[in-house]
């Protein structure tokens, strides 16, 4: 079930939290793979989410922050690292994307792997089991220019919402696994 909502819609945020909680509950390990670069305002959504998530919930297993971004040049290496270090983990990919004018500032949960770079005509490997995308600007004839001319304020606020929702879902996941492990003992 895919979800799309304006980032300021509290009902949408609650729906996202409920769906994320449902998706991760049966997995022992959850990895958050935040894709993008802080060198382009529109593409900084992923690294901002990763940074905010690590601040809110330091135990989260996050790849991709402002300090250590995951981008086109290192994506394959990071995906390989995740597969080796976290076999069988459930991976949630986070990235910015371009869309219709009417969809700008929307957050989407898509229940299939992410195709990073598709909006700017890059061919990169699919990543994640599900993905969260923030529609940061409109798509068009010159996608590189559009993603560069995106308001950081909007991206920042969307990243805060995504990170906060992920933190809540992961905290609930940790508590569930702790109780589950106690019952198994």
Residue ranges and their predicted role:
Residues 1-91, 96-185:
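N-terminal catalytic or cofactor-binding beta/alpha core of small enzyme domains
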């Amino acid at each position: 079930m895919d979800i799309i909502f304006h980032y300021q819609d509290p009902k949408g945020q609650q729906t996202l939290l409920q769906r994320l909680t449902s998706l991760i509950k049966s997995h022992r390990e959850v990895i958050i793979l935040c894709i993008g670069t802080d060198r382009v305002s529109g593409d900084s959504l992923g690294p901002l989410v990763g940074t905010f998530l690590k601040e809110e919930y330091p135990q989260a297993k996050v790849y991709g922050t402002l300090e250590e971004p995951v981008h086109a040049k290192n994506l394959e290496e990071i995906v390989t690292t995740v597969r080796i270090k976290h076999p069988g983990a459930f991976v949630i990919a986070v990235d910015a994307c371009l869309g219709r004018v009417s969809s700008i500032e929307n957050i989407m949960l898509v229940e299939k792997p992410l195709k990073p770079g598709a909006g700017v005509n890059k061919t990169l490997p699919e990543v994640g089991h599900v993905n969260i995308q923030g529609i940061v600007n409109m798509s068009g004839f010159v996608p590189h220019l559009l993603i560069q001319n995106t308001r950081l304020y909007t991206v920042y606020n969307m990243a805060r919402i995504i990170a906060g929702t992920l933190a809540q879902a992961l905290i609930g996941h940790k508590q569930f696994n702790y109780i589950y492990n106690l019952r198994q003992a």
